[in-house]
Regions:
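Short, highly selective alpha-helical patches that border small-molecule cofactor pockets
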Residues: 31-35, 39, 93
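PRPP-dependent phosphoribosyltransferase catalytic core
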Residues: 44, 49, 97-135
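Short glycine-rich phosphate-binding loop at a beta-alpha junction
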Residues: 20-29
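Active-site-facing substrate-recognition patch
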Residues: 1-20, 71
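Short, glycine/charge-rich flexible loops or terminal/linker lids adjacent to PRPP-binding catalytic cores
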Residues: 9-10, 44-79, 88-98
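Substrate/cofactor-recognition hotspot
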Residues: 85
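Structural motif
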Residues: 23, 79-81
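Alpha-helix capping/helix-boundary segments
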Residues: 30-31, 88
Length: 135
């Protein structure tokens, strides 16, 4: 498992030229920290939606991604940057796009396929924030 260190992450993020967006939507939990960094860079509002597909050991937990908070998304007709840390199967991003329909959506992932992405490799990456130990 490779490690993505903070300095490298910040460097890669600073090199991306994002188009204009109205909102950032982070997929919780994995997309929250990357989205917070992007929000700082773009200075636009951020929302969080909870979608889950995998367990903490990254094994599929459900047959399909599951929206954990069922409610109407109040934003329509906007340009949204949808952020997750990893996209392997695309199921989580697909579920989020269905939930956010009525908006123009681009995706960002640290690892995996996205409109914006640092890496697209099969091997799991250890994100800097995952090194924080639990008490």
């Amino acid at each position: 498992m490779n490690s993505v260190i903070w300095d490298k992450y910040i460097h890669l993020l600073n090199e991306i030229q994002f188009e204009d967006f109205d909102f950032i939507v982070a997929i919780g939990n994995g997309g929250i920290i990357p989205a917070a960094f992007i929000q700082k860079k773009l200075n636009i509002p951020m929302k969080i939606i909870k979608i889950n597909y995998r367990d903490p050991s990254h094994k599929p937990k459900y047959d399909d991604a599951v929206l954990l908070e069922e409610k109407d998304f109040p934003i329509k007709n906007k340009k949204i940057l949808l952020v997750d840390d990893v996209s392997r199967t695309g199921k989580t991003l697909k579920k989020a796009k269905e939930y956010l329909n009525g908006n123009t959506i681009k995706t960002f992932t640290i690892n995996g396929e996205g409109d914006y992405s640092f890496y697209n490799q099969e091997e799991c990456l250890l994100m800097p924030w995952t090194s924080i130990s639990h008490n």
